């Protein structure tokens, strides 16, 4: 008997940015709120599990802002914790925070430039969600 295999491609409807900074999450959330007029607040802890054993590896703090009627969904996630990182690869692992941004129909062109105006941020870059290894974790935030 023939077996069928379901092959689904997950499509990102969001942009993912990596941020390097020396400040804590609550302070960075406040700064992003100031820059973009968002209202990021503490949401929950995102748990990261080992793929092979299913054991809990690390917990990552999440700050979120959602406006359903305008299709705005923003999440700031602590990437680096003592137990490990959500991202994979030497470059993304040096990033302190991940910023997942879906602004519906609003253009995202100026996000990096706006964040770079902050004196509290040392680095901001665009990340490929699939290559950085966090695609599944970002979908858990929805």
Could you say what each language-model-derived stretch is?
Residues 23-39:
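Amphipathic alpha-helical segments
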Residues 47-84:
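Surface-exposed, low-hydrophobicity interaction/linker segments
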Residues 15-21, 95-104:
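Short cationic amphipathic helices and targeting signals
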Residues 37-48:
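Short, well-structured beta-strand/strand-turn elements
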Residues 2-10, 83-93:
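Short, flexible, solvent-exposed loop/turn segments with mixed acidic/basic and small polar residues
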Residues 23-25, 69, 105-107:
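Residues that cap or initiate secondary-structure elements
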Residues 6-25:
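Terminal, regulation- and interaction-focused segments at domain boundaries
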Residues 97-142:
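Glycine-rich, aromatic-bearing surface loops/beta-hairpins
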